[in-house]
Amino acid sequence: DVVLIQGIEPNMRWQQFTREILGLAAELEVSMVVTLGALLSDSPHTRPVPVTGSTSDPTLLETYALEASNYEGPTGIVGVLHEACQRFEVPSISLWAAVPHYVGQPPCPKATLALVRKIEDVLDIPVPLGDLVEEARAWEVGVDELAEDDEEVADYVRQLEQARDTTELPEASGEAIAREFERYLKRRNVD
C-alpha cells in the first residue's frame, strides 16, 4: 500500500508537523518515507526532466543509485522530516525534479511525470498515469510555442540544449533498458 500526503509546507510548528507525520507513519506501519519536490534549474524543457534523489540511509544509497545527503544550509520541512526519519530509523528518500527556470510557474506535468516514473522504480509498483502523459506533451508543446515567439528565449533554450547534450550521455545501459521494459509490462497490467 502507498500512503500519500499532499499539502502546503507549514510556516511554523515544524516539529509538531513532523511528529504527526511520523506518528501516522508508525500507525500505518510505513516501511519508507519518500518526499517529492521540484526545483528550478537550467534544464531545457525539450529534454527529459532530471530527477535527483538523496538519502542518508547507506542501503538506499546503493539500491537506488542516490546521492548521500550532505546539504548544509537553510532547509525546509523536507529537511526537518528526513532528519527526524533518520533519528527514528525510518528509511527515507527525497526526490526532486529539475524544472526549467524560464517556465517555473506550476503546474509542470512533465516534471510530475518524471517524479511518478521515479516513484515506480523506487517502490517497484506501476502507477496509473491517467492523462498525465498527454498533459506533459501538451505542456512541452505550449512551451515550444512560447519559445518560438521570442527569439531571445529560443536562443537561450538552444544554448541549454547544447550544454545538456555535451555533458550527459543518453541513458542506454542494459539496466536502464530493462527497467523501462519492466515498467512497460507492469503498466500494461494496470491500464
Task: Enumerate the language-model features and the residues they cover.
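Accessory terminal and edge-of-domain segments that mediate assembly/interaction
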Residues: 1-32, 40-191
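Acidic-aromatic/histidine active-site loop/patch
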Residues: 37
